[in-house]
Amino acid sequence: MALTVLLFILVISATSFGLIQNSLNEEEFYAEMQEKAVNASQVLVATKGNPDSWVKLNDLTGINSIGLAKENNVLDENKVDTLVDWNALKYAEIKEVLGLQKYDFYFKITEMDEHTVREFGILPGAEEKTILVERYILFQGTERKFILGVFK
């Protein structure tokens, strides 16, 4: 009887430890994904990129960072349109430049009423774990939302 109770306690302890470990791993996963999403959104909407004339390059190997801004939170329409045009052919390379190699991502620029003005990337499926970062920007002289989704 004592052996049965001891085995029961050991099984419960092992199961509890496994659940706690899974919970910690999931929290770590979301924290890392959140950090990557915030960093990518900051680079995109607050910087011009490096070099700041990256739109003139045909090859991403010369691009250290991709920024869409004319100035902080004011997006350059030409840069946005160039990135959107590159979506089909250069998505994987753009992910790498943004530091999102382990994830997929998308962004969209919307009117305040959620009407989409521009979008880039791959949309997540229903089962994907997704982090959203929303920023307020100026685009085409109008206040809009910039929404970045990072998922796996």
Where are these regions (language model features)?
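N-terminal signal-anchor/signal peptide hydrophobic helix marking the start
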Residues: 1-8
